Amino acid sequence: PLEVAIVCSANPEDYTARGKIVTPLKDRIGSEIRTHYPEDIEEGIAITAQEAWAQRDASNIEIPHYIRQIIEQIAFAAREDKKVDKRSGVSQRLPISTMELVISNAERRALLHDERFVVPRVGDIYAALPGITGKIELEYEGEMRGADTVIREIIRASVATIYDQYFADTNTQQIEQWFNLGGTVQLNDAQPASGSLAELQQIQGLIEKLGPLKINSESNPEITVSAAEFLLEGMYAHKRISRAEERVFTAAEKKQRNTDAANYAEKMREREIERDDYAKNRTRRGFN
């Protein structure tokens, strides 16, 4: 006689109604093993590190720990978000596939610029947006907002959460002031890490604030740029500065509106003075 063992895997409730084990078959299963989501970020990081395809051929990959934390935090935040369908859930496959996409985008950038080190950035997480939306089912409210909008908000909130673990006590006023004075910087894949680093070094006090991430003068450009972008993304997440979709960092929108309003008010005052002077001159000519 043959000894046959059957192992079945199914979600308790699947939105497609195809994943449930039929009752006659379930009655013949000896044991039911109930699993659960990772209980904390570090447990999720360990699972993702074990399962994700991270070892690439001919690539010197270095994944900063804060990138791992943000990716896991996205899953944790999505599980608590009211706009995400709790019945379908958010499985550990989300951070696993996201990590693979993040590494792939970083690897593409390194190959494009012939760089030795592959170091993922926060921008690579946003580049993985299509993969994240494919792993999440939304409630009605989320559908009305749009999947991309909901996921961007979750990523932004996740960056803010992890940012606070490193920079909660960091004074960023000097950096904010640089942007308030009209400074802008763009970080994208179009230029190598050395070029991005040269632009970032122009921001007063930025590189010096990266101490919590163990960045120093000997750190390679790829790692330094990734850390600096994380700090800027955290400031953007807390609305201390602004960022456009083209990844151009500028002054906070409120500061920009205040500046525009002040400039407008100044122009109006100048026009009033010109009108008063014109009226006075016209009056004088009338009496001559």
Residue ranges and their predicted role:
Residues 27-30, 42, 46, 50, ...:
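Short, surface-exposed, charged/polar-biased interaction segments
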